[in-house]
From Swiss-Prot:
Gene3D superfamilies named in the record: 1.20.5.5200, Stimulator of interferon genes protein
Outcome when changing E143A: Abolishes response to 2'-3' linked cGAMP and 3'-3' linked cGAMP and production of interferon IFNB1
Domain notes: In absence of cGAMP, the transmembrane and cytoplasmic regions interact to form an integrated, domain-swapped dimeric assembly. In absence of cyclic nucleotide (c-di-GMP or cGAMP), the protein is autoinhibited by an intramolecular interaction between the cyclic dinucleotide-binding domain (CBD) and the C-terminal tail (CTT). Following cGAMP-binding, the cyclic dinucleotide-binding domain (CBD) is closed, leading to a 180 degrees rotation of the CBD domain relative to the transmembrane domain. The pLxIS motif constitutes an IRF3-binding motif: following phosphorylation by TBK1, the phosphorylated pLxIS motif of STING1 recruits IRF3. IRF3 is then phosphorylated and activated by TBK1 to induce type-I interferons and other cytokines.
Modified sites of kind Phosphoserine: S241, S355, S358, S366
Binding site for 2',3'-cGAMP: S162, Y163, Y164, I165, G166, Y167, R238, A239, Y240, S241, T263
Protein name per Swiss-Prot or TrEMBL: Stimulator of interferon genes protein
Compartment(s): Endoplasmic reticulum membrane; Cytoplasm, Perinuclear region; Endoplasmic reticulum-Golgi intermediate compartment membrane; Golgi apparatus membrane
Organism: Rattus norvegicus (Rat)
Role: Facilitator of innate immune signaling that acts as a sensor of cytosolic DNA from bacteria and viruses and promotes the production of type I interferon (IFN-alpha and IFN-beta). Innate immune response is triggered in response to non-CpG double-stranded DNA from viruses and bacteria delivered to the cytoplasm. Acts by binding cyclic dinucleotides: recognizes and binds cyclic di-GMP (c-di-GMP), a second messenger produced by bacteria, cyclic UMP-AMP (2',3'-cUAMP), and cyclic GMP-AMP (cGAMP), a messenger produced by CGAS in response to DNA virus in the cytosol.
Region of interest (Cyclic dinucleotide-binding domain (CBD)), ranges: 153-340
Record text on subunit structure and interactions: Homodimer; forms a homodimer in absence of cyclic nucleotide (c-di-GMP or cGAMP); 'Lys-63'-linked ubiquitination at Lys-151 is required for homodimerization. Homotetramer; in presence of cyclic nucleotide (c-di-GMP or cGAMP), forms tetramers and higher-order oligomers through side-by-side packing. Interacts (when phosphorylated) with IRF3; following activation and phosphorylation on the pLxIS motif by TBK1, recruits IRF3. Interacts with RIGI, MAVS and SSR2. Interacts with RNF5 and TRIM56. Interacts with TBK1; when homodimer, leading to subsequent production of IFN-beta.
Length: 379
């Protein structure tokens, strides 16, 4: 089952298969070394040399990086040379401890080869400098993507949080009150269970026209919700408005809802069209999917916002020529109504209390020996 329920093409977060594959490779290499029949001391000697060489190679790379960062101490590190060193080298304690431990095992074990340590270090410096000069160890695109997702460096992450904090968080809490005001003026147009939410469209190709009737003529503008005004970033009474659309099916009105596109998708599309942004169509598609996933995760942690909006993610190129945006929106509205009925449950009928006329007749027998006359004045 896909991680996101919005669209099957939205990727899941990366798991730990990378480390699992490395562990399997570790076990396989240990078994192959054991099958060679070499003495353990000989294997440990070369393992220590190789680990020390790797760590020294990383240290050389970090020192070259430090040479560049020292020229930007004032602008990037607030004049702190220690911050620049930490940014390039990371944690020097663990790093140096591993190098010293590797050299200890290398020097304490018997050297079975005729090659001296100085020769090994010379070859190490030569190979590492050649690799950095020719950029032979650059990260693969998948590695860059994994780092950006893990550290939240993606464009989509910032856009999703900006869209939530700067827009959805402001309008969703008061949406139901504005809908009630609208219904009083427009004969309960948004009275259905599926019409009391904000429906946000997410075309993954980021094609966002300014007029919804251009995307589908069966989507017809009806009116505007009452505006919401709030002071925001120095702007007094900044107005936030939403549009109400009527959906047609077979030429007849089939529903009405509050409908709009996710405006950050326009930003992604504009970036892919501007060469200075360095944003390809593949980057745009990836960031659009991550934008949807991040926004879904944000709303999942905020129930008061999640229950007032619904995300509609679609990709027209994959759906084919038969795709209809109005039908997709109607499908979500009807699904919302079904979920509302399921959550509320079937109506419970309360059995009425039996009246006196519906009771069985009972014979009342007096405990007196003689019957009384009907006239009370004779008593």
């Amino acid at each position: 089952m896909p991680y996101s329920n919005l669209h099957p093409s939205i990727p899941r977060p990366r798991s730990y298969r990378f480390k699992l594959a490395a562990f399997v490779l570790l076990v396989g290499s240990l078994m192959s070394l054991w099958m060679t029949g070499e003495p353990p001391s000989h294997t440990l000697h070369y393992l220590a040399l190789h680990v020390a060489s790797q760590q020294l190679g990383l240290l050389l790379k970090k020192l070259c990086c430090l040479a560049e960062e020292l020229c930007h101490v004032q602008s990037r590190y607030q004049g702190s040379y220690w911050k620049a060193v930490r940014a390039c080298v990371g944690s020097p304690i663990c790093f140096m401890a591993l190098i010293l431990l590797s050299f200890y095992f290398y020097c304490s074990l018997e050297n079975t080869s005729d090659l001296r340590l100085a020769w090994h270090l010379g070859i190490l410096v030569l190979s590492k400098s050649l690799s950095m000069t020719l950029d032979l160890q650059s990260l693969a695109p998948a590695e860059v993507s994994a780092v950006c997702e893990e550290k939240n460096f993606n464009v989509a992450h910032g856009l999703a949080w900006s869209y939530y904090i700067g827009y959805l968080k402001l309008i969703l809490p008061g949406l139901q009150a504005r809908i009630r005001m609208f219904n009083q003026l427009h004969n309960n147009m948004l009275s259905g269970a599926g019409s009391r939410r904000l429906y946000i469209l997410f075309p993954l190709d980021c094609g966002v026209p300014d007029d919804l009737s251009v995307a589908d003529p069966n989507i017809r503008f009806r009116d505007m919700l009452p505006q919401q005004n709030t002071d925001r970033a120095g702007v007094k009474n900044r107005a936030y408005s939403n549009s109400v659309y009527e959906l047609l099916e077979n030429g007849q009105p089939a529903g009405a809802c509050i409908l709009e596109y996710a405006t950050p998708l326009q930003t992604l599309f504009a970036m892919s069209q501007d060469g200075k942004a360095g944003f390809s169509r593949e980057d745009r598609l990836e960031q659009a999917k991550l934008f949807c996933r991040t926004l879904e995760e944000i709303l999942a942690d905020v129930p008061e916002s999640r229950n007032h909006c619904r995300l509609i993610v679609y990709q027209e190129s994959e759906e084919g020529n038969s795709f209809s945006l109005s039908q997709e929106v109607l499908r979500h509205i009807r699904q919302e109504e079904k979920e509302e009925v399921t959550m509320s449950g079937p109506p419970t009928s309360v059995a009425p209390r039996p009246s006196l006329l519906s009771q069985e007749p009972r014979l009342l027998i007096s405990g007196m020996e003689q019957p009384l006359p009907l006239r009370t004045d004779l008593i």
